[in-house]
C-alpha cells in the first residue's frame, strides 16, 4: 500500500498534466506572535509583547496552498476585496504558483482576514474582518463567468471550499455541479452549515464530526445514530461518498459498499486549523491521479496527521508526505533510506531543533567492524549522521567490474539498521558534491587516510562555517582484505 502511495506521489504528483480548480471563500490568515509577561494596568487582560508576525493563505486559499505543496497545478476562483489584504493574499498565491486569473476583486466587500494573537503557542484572541453577506448580482455574475471560463480547460477535479462567507450560494453550487457532471468532472465539497441540499449531486463531501451531526440533526457522541444518519444523508444527496473527519479518531468513509474507518496516525496535536483543507486537497489529488477512493482517503488521513503537529494554518508538502510514508513503510529501513526531497525535509526539521548535521559517504560493501566503528565516531562529531552511499554503478567505476559484492539496496538496508546512522541516500555521481551542496552539512567526516584538502566538499563546508573531521580507521579492517581472504 505505501509503495503505491509513494509511486503516485513521486512519479505523478507534479509530473502529470493534471490541474484542479478550487472555488470558495478566500481568506488571509494573519498571526501575531509574542510573549506574555504581565497583566495590563488598564484592564484585567494580558499584555502581549509583539515579537513577529506571519501571513498565510486561509480558507479556500489554504486548500490551494495544500494542492500546490503536493505539486499539483491549481487554479482558484473566489471573491476578494480591493485592499492591502487582497494584495497580500494574491502575492501568497503567486508565490506558490497558483493561477489567480479567476478571482474577482470586488469594491463592495473587504478581503476576509482572520488575525490571531498568540502568546507563546497559546492563542489569546482572534480578530475577524469580513462581510459574510451573499454576493451581489454583479459579483455572482462575474464569478460565474470566471468559473465557466475555467471549466472550458477541463480540470481533473473541482473542490468547493465552503466557509459560509457568502461565495458558495445554492445557485452557484448547483451550477458548478451540473456543469461538472455533464463533463464527467468530479466535485468534492468541504461543507458548512446545517443544510447540505445545495451540494446535491456532488461526488463527495468531507464534513467533520460536529458538522455531520449538525447537518443530520443527531448528537455527535452517538456514533451509531450519527453513521446511520450520515448514510441517509449520502443517499439523499446522491453522493458517491461521504467522508467524516473525526480529528484524533481518524476518518470514517461511507460509500455504496458500506462504511469503513481509518484510524489516525498517533502524534501530538498542536493545532487543527486547516486540517480539513489538507484532507480535501490530498484526497482530491489522490483521486485525480487514479488512486482508489479508500486509498486516497488513507493518504489524506496521513497528510492531516502531519499538519496537526504544526502551529497555525500550515499546508502539507510533498516531501514531508513522502517522508511520512517512508517512515510507515518500514520501521527499520524506509524510515532512514531517503530520496533527496525527503532527506532535505528531514534535515530542515533537525536544524529547527538545533541539531548539527554530519555527512559522510562511501561504498560500504561487505559491512565490517571497521565500518561500524568509523560510523559511530563520525556520528559523535555532531547530532545527526547522513550517509551518502555509492550506487552499484558508481562502486564499479571506483573499484572495478567485480564490485560491489552486495547490491545497493541491501547495503542501504543494512546501514539503515545501525543506530549511528540517521539517514541513508544513494548517489550515482562520481563524487557527492551535489549532495553536499544540497544538504549543507555542519561537518563532513572522512577517514584519516585522507587529508583535509583531499576531502570532497571540504572547502564548501568550511565556506558556510562547517568543518572537516578526519576519523581514525581501524587497522587491517577492509572489504578488500575480506574478499582476498575468501578467495584464498
Swiss-Prot record:
Keywords, ordered alphabetically: ATP-binding, Carbohydrate metabolism, Kinase, Multifunctional enzyme, Nucleotide-binding, Nucleotidyltransferase, Transferase
EC number: 2.7.1.167, 2.7.7.70
Binding site for ATP: 208-211
Signal peptide (UniProt feature, chain positions): none
Annotated spans, Ribokinase: 1-332
SUPFAM superfamilies in UniProt: Nucleotidylyl transferase, Ribokinase-like
GO process terms (BP): ADP-L-glycero-beta-D-manno-heptose biosynthetic process
Enzyme class, UniProt record, top EC level: transferase
Classification via NCBIfam families: cyt_tran_rel, PRK11316.1, rfaE_dom_I, rfaE_dom_II
Protein known as: Bifunctional protein HldE
Organism of origin: Methylobacillus flagellatus (strain ATCC 51484 / DSM 6875 / VKM B-1610 / KT)
Gene that encodes it: hldE
Amino acid at each position: 500500500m505505501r509503495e503505491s502511495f509513494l509511486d503516485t506521489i513521486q512519479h505523478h504528483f507534479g509530473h502529470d498534466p493534471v490541474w484542479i480548480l478550487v472555488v470558495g471563500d478566500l481568506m488571509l490568515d494573519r498571526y501575531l506572535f509574542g510573549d506574555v509577561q504581565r497583566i495590563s494596568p488598564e484592564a484585567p487582560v494580558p499584555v502581549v509583547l509583539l515579537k513577529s508576525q506571519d501571513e498565510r493563505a486561509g480558507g479556500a486559499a489554504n486548500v490551494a496552498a495544500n494542492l500546490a505543496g503536493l505539486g499539483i497545478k491549481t487554479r482558484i476562483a473566489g471573491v476578494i476585496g480591493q485592499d492591502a489584504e487582497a494584495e497580500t493574499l494574491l502575492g501568497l498565491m503567486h508565490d506558490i504558483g497558483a493561477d489567480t486569473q479567476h478571482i474577482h476583486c470586488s469594491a463592495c466587500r473587504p478581503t476576509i482576514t482572520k488575525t490571531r494573537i498568540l502568546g507563546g503557542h497559546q492563542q489569546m484572541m482572534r480578530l475577524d474582518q469580513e462581510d459574510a453577506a451573499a454576493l451581489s448580482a454583479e459579483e455572482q455574475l462575474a464569478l460565474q463567468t470566471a468559473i465557466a471560463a475555467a471549466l472550458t480547460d477541463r480540470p481533473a477535479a473541482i473542490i468547493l471550499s465552503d466557509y459560509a462567507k457568502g461565495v458558495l450560494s445554492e445557485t452557484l453550487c448547483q451550477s458548478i455541479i451540473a456543469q461538472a457532471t455533464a463533463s464527467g468532472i468530479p466535485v468534492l465539497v468541504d461543507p458548512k452549515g446545517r443544510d447540505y441540499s445545495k451540494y446535491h449531486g456532488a461526488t463527495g463531501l468531507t464534513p467533520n464530526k460536529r458538522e455531520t451531526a449538525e447537518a443530520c440533526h443527531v448528537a455527535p457522541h452517538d456514533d451509531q445514530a450519527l453513521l446511520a444518519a450520515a448514510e441517509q444523508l449520502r443517499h439523499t444527496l446522491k453522493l458517491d461518498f461521504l467522508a467524516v473527519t473525526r480529528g484524533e479518531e481518524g476518518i470514517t468513509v461511507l460509500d455504496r459498499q458500506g462504511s469503513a474507518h481509518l484510524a489516525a496516525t498517533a502524534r501530538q496535536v498542536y493545532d487543527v486549523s486547516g486540517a480539513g483543507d489538507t484532507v480535501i486537497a490530498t484526497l482530491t489529488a489522490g483521486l485525480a491521479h487514479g488512486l482508489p477512493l479508500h486509498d486516497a482517503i488513507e493518504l489524506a488521513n496521513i497528510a492531516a496527521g502531519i499538519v496537526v503537529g504544526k502551529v497555525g494554518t500550515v499546508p502539507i508538502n510533498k516531501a514531508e508526505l513522502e517522508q511520512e510514508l517512508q517512515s510507515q513503510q518500514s520501521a527499520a529501513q524506509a524510515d532512514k533510506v531517503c530520496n533527496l526531497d525527503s532527506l532535505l525535509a528531514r534535515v530542515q526539521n533537525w536544524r529547527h531543533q538545533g541539531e548539527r548535521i554530519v555527512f559522510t559517504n562511501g561504498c560500504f560493501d561487505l559491512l565490517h567492524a571497521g565500518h561500524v566503528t568509523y560510523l559511530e565516531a563520525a556520528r559523535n562529531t555532531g547530532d545527526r549522521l547522513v550517509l551518502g552511499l555509492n550506487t552499484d554503478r558508481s562502486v564499479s567505476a571506483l573499484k572495478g567490474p567485480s564490485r560491489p559484492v552486495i547490491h545497493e539496496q541491501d547495503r542501504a538496508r543494512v546501514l539503515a539498521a545501525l543506530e549511528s546512522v540517521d539517514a541513508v541516500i544513494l548517489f550515482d555521481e562520481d563524487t557527492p558534491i551535489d549532495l553536499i551542496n544540497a544538504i549543507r552539512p555542519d561537518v563532513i567526516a572522512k577517514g584519516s587516510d585522507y587529508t583535509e584538502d583531499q576531502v570532497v566538499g571540504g572547502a564548501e563546508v568550511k565556506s558556510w562555517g562547517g568543518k572537516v573531521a578526519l576519523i581514525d580507521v581501524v587497522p587491517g579492517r577492509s572489504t578488500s582484505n575480506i574478499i582476498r581472504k575468501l578467495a584464498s
